Amino acid sequence: MSISLTPLEDKIIVKQAEAETQTASGLFIPDNAKEKPQQGEVLAVGPGRRNDAGERIPVDVKVGDKVLYSKYGGTEVHYQGEDYLIVSARDILAILG
């Protein structure tokens, strides 16, 4: 999936995974009770922050990585009919294998 958003510095654009809609026992979960997803796919990565010498510090993730991120990290944005999450690199907890 390609998007026309370019993140700045160490920002990362993530397409959030869908929240669970049904429990293991078959009960449907109403929208207001769904857990906020903490994983998704990286769609775009900024060039990284600059250190004191002005050199770029590379970001550890790349486009296509499946990541786990902080539950309250990031900013949800709605752009061209789609929902995205913009997070800082420090809010990425792990790359899923």
UniProtKB/Swiss-Prot annotation:
GO terms for biological process: chaperone cofactor-dependent protein refolding. Belongs to the GroES chaperonin family. Pfam families: Cpn10 (PF00166). Keywords: Chaperone, Cytoplasm. The gene is groES. Gene3D superfamilies: GroES chaperonin (2.30.33.40). GO terms for molecular function: ATP binding; metal ion binding; protein folding chaperone; protein-folding chaperone binding; unfolded protein binding. The keyword Chaperone applies. NCBIfam families: PRK00364.1-2, PRK00364.1-6, PRK00364.2-2, PRK00364.2-4, PRK00364.2-5. SMART domains: Cpn10. Its main location: cytoplasm. Together with the chaperonin GroEL, plays an essential role in assisting protein folding. The GroEL-GroES system forms a nano-cage that allows encapsulation of the non-native substrate proteins and provides a physical environment optimized to promote and accelerate protein folding. GroES binds to the apical surface of the GroEL ring, thereby capping the opening of the GroEL channel. It is found in: Cytoplasm. This is Co-chaperonin GroES. Heptamer of 7 subunits arranged in a ring. Interacts with the chaperonin GroEL. One of its GO terms (cellular component) is cytoplasm. The keyword Ion transport does not apply.
